Swiss-Prot record:
Entry's Gene Ontology molecular function annotations: GTP binding; GTPase activity; guanosine tetraphosphate binding; translation elongation factor activity
Top-level taxon in the UniProt lineage: Bacteria
Official protein name in the record: Elongation factor G
Organism: Psychrobacter sp. (strain PRwf-1)
Principal place of residence: cytoplasm
GO biological process, one term: ribosome disassembly
Upper taxonomic lineage: Bacteria, Pseudomonadati, Pseudomonadota, Gammaproteobacteria, Moraxellales
UniProt keyword terms in alphabetical order: Cytoplasm, Elongation factor, GTP-binding, Nucleotide-binding, Protein biosynthesis
Length: 709
């Protein structure tokens, strides 16, 4: 079967934006104009096609990056038909993982900005991720019909806040209620969209007189940018010759794909103006799969050589699984981006990460919530595979004879944990199935059982992230659960060395109990990774060998439950060196108790301390909020380790802060910086808890022990 659309007419793009920039409405209009969607869905009525999970419809924010395929031949049918695969990305900072995941498989991105709000914090986060994966981008300034809309201010912010190089391709005709259309700076014509046909039709007119001068000023800026593409154009420009429209298009395309410039468009998706022109730009300036560098990977040889896969049907098959979803009708869906080669339904692929072969069942192309069956997928395609058994997010699927492992995605460590408990016994099993499925879909969500409390602990990227996962558990899996408060895992250890006696004697009628030991306790280096060591140096059999294991067991059981404040004890070496026994009354239990008693007393005499987890925190913030953020980190017992300058006037602060002080930080950092600062944190080390804090924790725990001598 031949390829339906030539590869050079493919565009794999993402639409990315801050929460309220109107990205979903923009995507809806794209689907409408490209003929996929016949009735326009509105986010604020909760019916947008791309937002197909129930909570997204309720909250009006996009959570899952759904992949959709559509076709476009230009506003005036001036191009051959192009295939556009759109990946919708979420705009909330807790879903950064989704954005990162989609950036990884895109060839280009369209950044949507609100004409009133401009460049906002999530825009900065998304921008950094697009930089990381070197994704070419264009910008669309939406909501030009709103009070306070200002295209030129947003253009300036892209330059100053993001360090981008924006180039206006159109300028607006009017603004707010008077926004009527745009001026195309290449053709120098005014474009007005027809209201009756919901913007399907348009007409070109002469530029309004009052905008002629402004249009000429911005056109000369555009031509100069185009002339910088190569020497021939530069010479032509410097000699005062006019560049042709074709030359300008080719130059802007080249510079956009090289990540040198950001073409900017504007409009109002809600009023059906401007999105059509931006779609033309996707075809004109966004890269086809073969315009971006070939994907790199590691070949399956001894030396682990780096290899590449060219975007071509003739190259060996290689694809990346970038999202796993559960569909209520077909079950497990694995979204893949095919980089090279062809695969047909029923054929097998190899997963080098799991070292397994899997057979491809059905292949479906997704349109938001409906799907079309395919017989095969080829280089450049984005589609979903049904029924893959053991494929995780970020895994490679490739030809078994030509094995390559594509660069894996990096997933951040979760920063917040909560305990969840099923409300009834019946919910218990459903809950573990639900959590398992959700963790498979979302690599930034982890589940484990706390050994100390037996509770199920879920961890994720933020409070909203966990809230939505708990919500999905309720809706999709019908599991009712109680949620606990966020917790910190403290530890206990000793700083000094002691020798301590432990005696356990019971004398009741008949056989008694007798165990007697001397232990030496000393601290171990916490960085060594060894939490406990037991040695025996008993001379002359004063404690018979068969009881040594019991002493060790008594110590370990005592360590598990802590002594100072009920937290596990780490970093202790115990040496059994002396003691005594009784022929009749001694047994294993007696020596287990004696070991436990000696350890408890010795621990309290060996300068015991409480340890707390310390996190490595990185905050990226515009300079004007730096003072507030530094002051706040100091109040949280943070130690600032260093600072760096980032492009666009952003500062990066690196600090070490105790986890106990970081709860609620996401909300604080947003309010201190009007939402413009972002942060990440990961576990760094365990460190001694200051005395005042430790006393507070110990006060809550009053250890009641019934050991007797």
């Amino acid at each position: 079967m031949a390829r339906a659309t030539p590869l050079n007419r493919y565009r794999n793009i993402g639409i990315s934006a801050h929460i309220d920039a109107g990205k979903t409405t923009t995507t809806e209009r794209i689907l409408f104009y490209t003929g996929v969607s016949h009735k326009i869905g509105e986010t604020h009525e909760g019916s947008a096609t791309m937002d197909w999970m129930e909570q997204e419809q309720e909250r009006g924010i996009t959570i899952t990056s759904a992949a959709t395929t559509c076709f476009w031949s230009g506003m005036g049918q001036q191009f051959p038909q192009h295939r556009i695969n759109i990946i919708d990305t979420p705009g909330h900072v807790d879903f950064t993982i989704e954005v990162e995941r989609s950036m990884r498989v895109l060839d280009g991105a369209c950044m949507v900005y609100c004409a009133v709000g401009g460049v906002q914090p999530q825009s900065e986060t998304v921008w950094r991720q697009a930089n990381k994966y070197k994704v070419p981008r264009l910008a669309f300034v939406n909501k030009m019909d709103r009070v306070g809309a200002d295209f030129y201010r947003v253009k300036e912010q892209v330059k100053t806040r993001l360090g981008g190089n924006p180039v206006a391709m159109v300028i607006p005709i009017g603004k707010e209620d008077d926004f009527e259309g745009v001026i195309d700076l290449i053709t120098m014509k005014a474009i007005y969209w027809d209201v009756e046909s919901l913007g399907m039709k348009f007409e070109e007119r002469e530029i309004p007189e009052e905008l002629q001068e402004k249009a000429e000023e911005y056109r000369s800026e555009l031509v100069e940018v185009a002339a910088e593409a190569n020497e021939d154009l530069m010479n032509k420009y410097l000699e005062g010759e006019e560049l042709t429209e074709d030359e300008i298009h080719a130059a802007i395309r080249q510079r956009t794909i090289n990540n040198e410039i950001i073409p900017m468009y504007c409009g109002t998706a809600f009023k059906n103006k401007g999105v059509q022109k931006m779609l033309d730009a996707v075809i004109q300036y966004m890269p086809a799969p073969q315009d971006v560098p070939a994907i790199k990977g590691i070949l399956d040889d001894k030396a682990e050589t780096e290899g590449t896969r060219e975007a071509s049907d003739d190259a060996p098959f290689a694809a990346l699984a970038f999202k796993i979803m559960n569909d209520k009708f077909v079950g497990n869906l694995t979204f893949v981006r095919v980089y090279s080669g062809v695969i047909k339904q029923g054929e097998s692929v190899y997963n080098p990460v799991k070292m397994k072969r899997e057979r491809i069942g059905r292949i479906v192309q997704m349109h938001a919530d409906s799907q079309q069956e395919l017989d095969e997928i080829r280089a450049g395609d984005i589609a979903a595979l049904v029924g893959m058994k053991d494929v995780g997010t970020g895994d490679t699927l490739c030809d078994e004879k030509e094995i390559i492992t594509l660069e894996r995605m990096e997933f951040p460590e979760p920063v917040i944990s909560l305990a969840v408990e099923p409300k009834t016994k019946a919910d218990q099993e459903k809950m573990s199935i639900a959590l398992g499925r959700l963790a498979k879909e979302d690599p930034s969500f982890r589940v484990h059982t706390d050994e100390e409390s037996g509770q199920t602990i879920i961890s994720g990227m933020g409070e909203l992230h966990l809230e939505i996962l708990v919500d999905r558990m309720k809706r999709e899996f019908k599991v009712e659960a109680n949620i606990g408060a966020p917790q910190v895992a403290y530890r206990e250890t000793i700083r000094g060395t002691v020798e301590q006696e432990g005696k356990f004697v019971r004398q009741t009628g008949g056989r008694g109990k007798f165990g007697h030991v001397w232990l030496k306790l000393e601290p171990l280096d916490l960085d060594s990774g060894v939490d406990y060591q037991f040695e025996e140096q008993v001379v002359g059999g004063v404690v018979p060998k068969e009881y040594h294991g019991a002493v060790d067991k008594g110590i370990q059981e005592r360590m598990k439950n802590g002594i100072l404040a009920g937290y596990p004890i780490v970093g202790v070496k115990a040496t059994l060196y002396d003691g005594s026994y009784h022929d009749v009354d001694s047994d294993e239990l007696s020596f287990k108790m004696a070991g436990s008693i000696a350890f408890k007393k010795g621990f309290m005499n060996a300068n015991p301390v409480l340890l707390e987890p310390v996190m490595k925190v990185e905050v990226e913030t515009p300079e004007e909020y730096m003072g507030d953020i530094m002051g706040d980190l100091n109040r949280r017992r943070g130690m600032v380790q260093g600072m760096d300058d980032l492009p666009g006037g952003t500062k990066q602060i690196r600090a070490e802060v105790p986890l106990a002080e970081m709860f609620g930080y996401a909300t604080n950092v947003r309010s201190m910086s009007q939402g413009r600062a972002t942060y990440s944190m990961e576990f760094q080390k365990y460190a001694e808890t200051p005395k005042s804090v430790a006393e507070e924790i110990m006060k809550k725990f009053s250890g009641k022990d019934d050991d007797e001598e």
